[in-house]
Amino acid sequence: MWFMRAADGYLFGALTPSCIETLRGVPMLIESEDERVRARLLPETYEDHESEAHWRAHAAPELERLFVARTVLVRKDLMAMRQLDFDSGIVLMIPDSHVNAWLATLNAARLALFVLNEMTAAHFERKGLKICTPKQAEAVARIHFLAGMQEVLLGAVDHGEEEDPLTDAAASE
């Protein structure tokens, strides 16, 4: 897989079939009715039963609407994936206006994969793959892939852009 910063977003290319399958599964993970996923995405926030009930009645529905709205944007971008040419494979364009939706959705998908595969922090340690079932090992790889996309979207990955000494000098004044 490769990625680049475009004028109006981020372009991810040469996506493998596994990457495409993972990405296409993201909306389904967010929409899961599995109680473990719902509990992870909307955890208990108050020890007091009355406060928790109030939060569930008033705040949780709004968060659910946000999940739905973000998932709609992500699904729209996924439906627009195309093969540009034979060598570049499938490409995904994430417009700047959708980056926040993608970040939130990717994070939620990672949380869902974690709980659906009954994982613990130990699965992500240096020797964690030794304790993983094959299904958990696959989930670890998918979680790392989604985290890598988040890193790109957060700007934590060098895009190979050369520094402009004039801009850098002006910024330091």
Residue ranges and their predicted role:
Residues 1-93, 98-101, 105-173:
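Charged, alpha-helix-forming regions
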